[in-house]
């Protein structure tokens, strides 16, 4: 149904798929959480989140919380985090019925983790929310650099609009690093 005007070299009427930036923040201070309220909608089914250099307190995890606009209601999840480190060690963690998704495993305060994940169907009231992702971090327990593979599925099918990043204990962020967190929606047509 689209047309191409060769004289003006403009393209009109074609679908514009791809990643569309929804929100991006930088942080270089200690905070209890980084909130993206009302970032999920019926516009997209799939979201891509990038977290660059976000420090945590020593031996803590960065957690994702999926909830309504004021986080008074949040989803519970079944989570798997598999981890490989440079010492050729493998470990994994499993959690069920928890109101968060661990994005790294006992990260170090001096080396900020970087994380990327894809979130499927957070706004759907029919399909469960699912998460797949990777994280790169320095693991305090064991003192090694690690790669984490993440997988998670919500226990229910409630429409959610917001994402919160917080720490398993203590604060996120540091004046020593400027972290950036960006959320993109995947336009499918």
Each language-model region and where it sits:
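Intrinsic low-complexity, repeat-rich intrinsically disordered segments enriched
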Residues: 1-18
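Surface-exposed molecular-recognition determinants
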Residues: 14-189
